[in-house]
């Protein structure tokens, strides 16, 4: 009898502990993003996993913690293409984002030098298309102001640098190099370097000064995670990290100092030994390859010349090498993510990857797919290749892209609806820090065809449906990295990763969505961000 009583007490104790671990979340609506687009009023969690969903009354007791949200619960938003660590690790650099002229840049550099006594000056984030005069400057003013110190000013896309003579001297370019890099080293009419370098030379200069760079900035990475949470991001795909970034992030995840789910691709040439941490929130997915450059730097590889130039851009990896990388990924069952912006690069990527991905579920991705020839859209479906796109790029670029590509670009550039119609699904991201991490801006841009900060409602790009846009930031983003069984929708058995907003993205009007507030972000059942009242 005594033994039975003890067993009874143990069962009661276990039941009480189980009840204490239960968390009930209630909201105005829960949008699940499941196959039927089901909605609910409450969700029950246990140990960070979704256990039950419902609309009617839930019989609870004081052992079940209940939180009521005045808002709408969504699956945790996933940024399907961003550079999580890039901006955080660049905090020591002179911030040139949103500058409106080269004069403003010079003023910032002068102020920066007073407070930063480094052996060089490194600035980051300028975009000449934000200036009143978008003409690229040369190094003369930098040479005059900083004759004895290397000055490196990287464009917002990371594919172009303006530097002074002292920085160019670090490259030690020979006459042979000048021929090798003729498309990447800008020369004036007299054959003198202007200070503008691109692509491989950018990487080469970065490597030369990397030994002088701060190796650790843990606090900045942790702060960056909170910035993502504040914007409603509950997971991310980090596209193209190097060994240094990997080591920093892996250590922070191991210590539990970073929690945001991170599904990462490494730059080609680096494969980590330890590809998944115990917390299952820092997971290697595959290799990222840069096939071409960018439109802003005029290095995206096109089928036709850029307007008023004799250049079609730059192919950074030849077809044979891309084929070799494809074989490597295929044999190792890794995903392959190819940066392809120009229509020529996209055609090469589609046809090369397609040899291995056709009729197979490899989930290989083309990142950006900004310019695609009309005859090539169908290949995304034919070869089962995922378009991974960033709608806010189209908003940022629309003022100058026609002048760069011609009127034909209106049919081939930033054609997200055509991509979706072909591929049947797509992953949406921001390319942060090139664009802001704001997922509401992503949704707004691709649904309403305009920028969230624009005052008019003129359609800039063809829109897609609200449901498809939401899926692109949730279940399709998860599917793009083989995580759809764990995250991306609110279903029983999945992780409790939620984004809670003040608005209903599927029904509220355009102006109301523009003013959406992130109420809370939840990862693994724990509130990692809550809007202060």
Where are these regions (language model features)?
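Divalent metal-binding segments
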Residues: 20-27, 31, 35-270, 289, ...
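Short beta->alpha connector loops
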Residues: 241-243, 268-270, 369-372, 504-506
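Hydrophobic, small-residue-rich alpha-helical packing segments that form membrane-like cores
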Residues: 270-272, 284
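Non-cysteine beta-strand/loop elements that form the S-adenosyl-L-methionine
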Residues: 283-299, 385-395
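His/Asp/Glu-enriched, well-ordered alpha-helical/loop segment
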Residues: 327-337, 344-364, 368-369, 375-378, ...
């Amino acid at each position: 009898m005594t033994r039975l009583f003890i067993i009874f007490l143990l069962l009661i104790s276990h039941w009480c502990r189980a009840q204490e671990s239960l968390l009930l979340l209630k909201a105005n609506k829960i949008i699940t993003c499941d196959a039927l687009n089901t909605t609910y009023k409450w969700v029950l969690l246990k140990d960070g996993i979704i256990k039950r969903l419902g609309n009617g009354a839930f019989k609870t007791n004081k052992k079940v913690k209940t939180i009521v949200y005045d808002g709408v619960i969504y699956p945790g938003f996933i940024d399907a293409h961003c550079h999580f660590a890039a901006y955080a690790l660049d905090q020591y650099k002179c911030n040139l984002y949103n500058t409106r002229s080269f004069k403003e840049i010079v003023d910032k550099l002068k102020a920066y030098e007073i407070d930063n006594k480094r052996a060089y000056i490194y600035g980051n984030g300028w975009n000449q298309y934000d200036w009143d005069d978008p003409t690229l400057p040369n190094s003369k003013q930098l040479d005059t102001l900083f004759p004895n110190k290397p000055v490196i000013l990287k464009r917002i896309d990371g594919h172009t640098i303006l530097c002074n003579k002292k920085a160019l001297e670090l490259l030690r370019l020979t006459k042979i190099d000048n021929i090798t890099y003729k498309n990447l080293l800008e020369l004036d009419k007299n054959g003198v370097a202007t200070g503008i370098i691109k692509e491989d030379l950018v990487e080469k200069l970065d490597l030369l000064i990397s030994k002088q760079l701060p190796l650790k900035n843990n606090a900045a990475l942790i702060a960056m995670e909170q910035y993502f949470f504040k914007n409603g991001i509950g997971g991310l795909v980090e596209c193209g990290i190097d060994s240094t970034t990997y080591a920093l992030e892996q250590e922070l995840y191991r210590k539990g100092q970073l929690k945001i789910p991170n599904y990462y691709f490494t730059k080609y040439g680096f494969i980590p030994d330890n590809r998944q941490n115990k917390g299952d929130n820092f997971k290697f997915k595959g290799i990222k390859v840069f096939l071409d450059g960018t439109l802003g730097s005029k290095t995206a590889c096109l089928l036709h010349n850029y307007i008023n130039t004799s250049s079609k851009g730059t192919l950074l990896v030849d077809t044979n090498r891309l084929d070799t990388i494809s074989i490597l990924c295929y044999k190792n069952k890794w995903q392959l993510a190819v940066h392809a912006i120009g229509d020529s690069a996209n055609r090469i990527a589609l046809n090369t990857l397609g040899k291995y991905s056709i009729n197979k579920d490899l989930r290989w991705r083309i990142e950006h797919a900004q310019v695609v020839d009309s005859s090539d859209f169908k290949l995304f479906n034919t070869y089962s290749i995922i378009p991974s796109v960033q709608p806010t790029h189209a908003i940022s670029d629309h003022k100058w892209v026609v002048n760069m590509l011609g009127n034909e670009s209106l049919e081939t550039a930033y054609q997200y609806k055509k991509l979706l119609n072909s591929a049947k699904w797509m992953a949406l991201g921001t390319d942060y820090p090139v664009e802001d991490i704001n997922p509401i801006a992503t949704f707004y841009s691709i649904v309403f065809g305009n920028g969230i900060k624009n005052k008019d409602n003129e359609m800039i790009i063809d829109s897609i449906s609200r449901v498809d846009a939401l899926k692109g930031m949730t279940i399709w983003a998860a599917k793009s990295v083989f995580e759809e069984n764990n995250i991306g929708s609110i279903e029983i058995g999945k992780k409790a990763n939620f984004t809670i907003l003040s608005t209903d993205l599927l029904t509220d009007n355009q102006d109301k969505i523009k003013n959406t507030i992130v109420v809370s972000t939840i990862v693994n059942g724990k509130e990692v961000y809550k809007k202060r009242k």
